[in-house]
Amino acid sequence: MRFALPITALLALAACAPAPVTKNETEGLDYGPRPVRHQDEIRSYLSVRLKDPKAAIVEFRTEPQQMYQRRVAVRDMHYGWATCVNVNDKDTRGAFQGFYPVVFFFRHEKIVQVNGGPGDFGIGAQYARSQCEHLGAPFKG
């Protein structure tokens, strides 16, 4: 009996796990060409959103890879060439806050979605961690 609750909770959690993306979901989507200037675009995006963009440390963890993000209650469907970046910005006192993962989606050399970026903590941070792992760069922080 004492194992019934944990087992029930585990089964309920497993039932919530998303199913793998199917070919039907991604069929016909135009990802566009693989981005060439993604690092410049990311730096430009961050330069107007970070507290101290000149001092921030930006680590490009992966090269762009095709990725599809399903629509859920708190996020729209997005697709494109995704890349994982770790960012360490300074706080208002000038101290580094620590690295956090960010995933950028590109189509036709433009950023179309950001998960985990500045101001997108909570669910966005969870998406970024999961997507970085899927892209081959698990966040260890």
Task: Locate predicted features.
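C-terminal motif of bacterial Sec signal peptides marking the signal peptidase cleavage site
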Residues: A12-A15
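Cystatin/cathelin-like cysteine-protease inhibitor module
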Residues: A17-G141
